[in-house]
């Protein structure tokens, strides 16, 4: 046995232990993935395929932010920011999957934005040898899309007609919240309401992903002394379960 084939869970189950029933909380159910994880871009504005915000982007932790995404359709989402993003990006809490605002990391982010703008202008020249610079925390090197105007950015994102109007209206509405110091949609704290006004403007596309399971989901239920319990939640004498074979490892997800 390899130790990673579920043997421990199966043996306990065959001995009468109770297997965690669905729905089973997952791990890292961020809902959005490559080229980056939207949950670690809380300073931006997130909109869905209908060009509408759908949550407070600035929840305390990356996991809580990412959790909002699993309730959305499995369609492309977008993070929108302006040219001041390198400043805004530094406003974050020390945490797992956070941004370490060192000088080199901030510069790496600036380089990513400048590269996107150069590609937009048609002046970008691919370097002879691509150096692997500092990532600056998760997904700093995400591929940005740049434009001089929000209208042009909407075009690049594929929004037309009513969708484009909805996109522009949503950003305008959000910017008003920034001016007023109160997010009337989702209650984002005034201290982290960063406007999208300074050109050039940038966006990142995010595609849906169900998650990244690293450990057992839906294992054997135990009591506080690691006794496996039966279907009536009574401890089974002499049968103990711990580690990756345990169920109920997470509440709603990896938080």
PLM regions and their residue ranges:
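Alpha-helix capping and helix-loop boundary segments enriched in small/acidic/polar residues
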Residues: 1-3, 34, 38-41, 233, ...
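A conserved FAD-binding loop/helix module that cradles the flavin
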Residues: 1-10, 246-255
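Flavin-binding catalytic cores
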Residues: 7-20, 165, 169
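An anion/pyrophosphate-binding glycine-rich loop and adjacent beta-alpha core
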Residues: 9, 18-159
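Residue-level detector of alpha-helical segments with a strong bias toward transmembrane helices
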Residues: 26, 61, 236, 253-254
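A glycine-rich dinucleotide-binding beta-alpha-beta segment and adjacent secondary-structure elements
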Residues: 149, 156-249, 253
